């Protein structure tokens, strides 16, 4: 992407090593932390080279036109940030991403974790991603507060009943689709039994209902990236998508079929449709 004139920004989330805060899996706090990066890239937020030297760093090189893309949990954060309606976020490309955390962990009031993750729940994923714990000095100063945060998550997620409550509603980004100003290019695997298609399809349908520019590419893979998948033309489509929504290039990508589905019998064939 650099050779095509794009700069790449990598950002650690709340609770990651050398960061601050706690990992709270899909919470409003996590979403707003990533949103702050978009604000910084657009000159609305200050940033510093580190936490002690008070040396400010500006994103003066940025046009203010920003895209977000990632897979799985990080792709989920792309959706979350888009639902804030933050100015400057022109498009997102979430791959194998979650649009509703309740539907990821619960089905009909039952606990239904991803395949291979039996016993998993929201607080366990938060603990798994809490890499601040890998810094002994840092962790020693926060471990009691973090233990309290874990206890609060365990109570709020209400595993015993499986009920949908305010805790889960905060993590249901479908509630805020009408706030999205960015275009959306969804990529998902039909055979993904980690993040299932009950995440991407309701999201795409909600985008259609709101008239938000959207594209969905469903491949036959599992919980994977498909950038180099033979016959998918994924990278070419992504390049043209970004050229249009970040650089304003009139290349017709927005007029092409909105849905592409890889054939299960011939993986060189992609079925196209204007809607799902």
Task: Pin down the residues of each PLM region.
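Gly/Ser-rich "nucleophile elbow"/oxyanion-hole loop immediately N-terminal to the catalytic nucleophile
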Residues: 24-29, 36-72
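Conserved alpha/beta-hydrolase "acid-adjacent" motif
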Residues: 193-199
């Amino acid at each position: 992407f650099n050779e095509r004139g794009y700069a790449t920004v990598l950002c650690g989330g709340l609770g990651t090593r050398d960061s601050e805060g706690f990992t709270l899996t899909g919470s409003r706090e996590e979403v707003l932390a990533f949103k702050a990066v978009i604000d910084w890239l657009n000159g609305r937020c200050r940033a510093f080279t580190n936490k002690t030297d008070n040396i400010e760093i500006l994103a003066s090189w940025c046009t203010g036109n920003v895209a977000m893309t990632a897979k799985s949990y990080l792709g989920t954060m792309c959706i979350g940030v888009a639902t804030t309606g933050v100015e400057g976020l022109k498009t997102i490309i979430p791959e194998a991403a979650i649009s509703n955390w309740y539907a990821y962990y619960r089905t009909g009031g039952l606990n239904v974790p991803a395949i291979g993750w039996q016993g998993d729940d929201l607080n366990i994923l938060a603990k798994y991603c809490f890499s601040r714990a890998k810094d002994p000095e840092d962790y020693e100063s926060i471990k009691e507060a973090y233990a309290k945060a874990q206890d609060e998550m365990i109570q709020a997620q209400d595993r015993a009943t499986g009920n949908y409550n305010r805790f889960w509603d905060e993590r249901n980004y479908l509630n805020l689709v009408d706030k999205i100003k960015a275009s959306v290019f969804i990529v998902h695997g039909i055979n993904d039994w980690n993040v299932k298609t009950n995440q991407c399809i309701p999201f795409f349908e909600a985008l259609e209902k709101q008239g938000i520019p959207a594209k969905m590419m469903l491949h036959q893979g599992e919980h994977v990236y498909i950038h180099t998948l033979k016959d998918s033309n994924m990278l070419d489509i992504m390049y043209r998508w970004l050229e249009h929504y970040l650089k304003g290039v009139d290349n017709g990508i927005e007029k092409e079929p909105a849905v592409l589905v890889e054939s299960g019998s011939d993986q060189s064939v992609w079925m196209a449709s204007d809607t799902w």
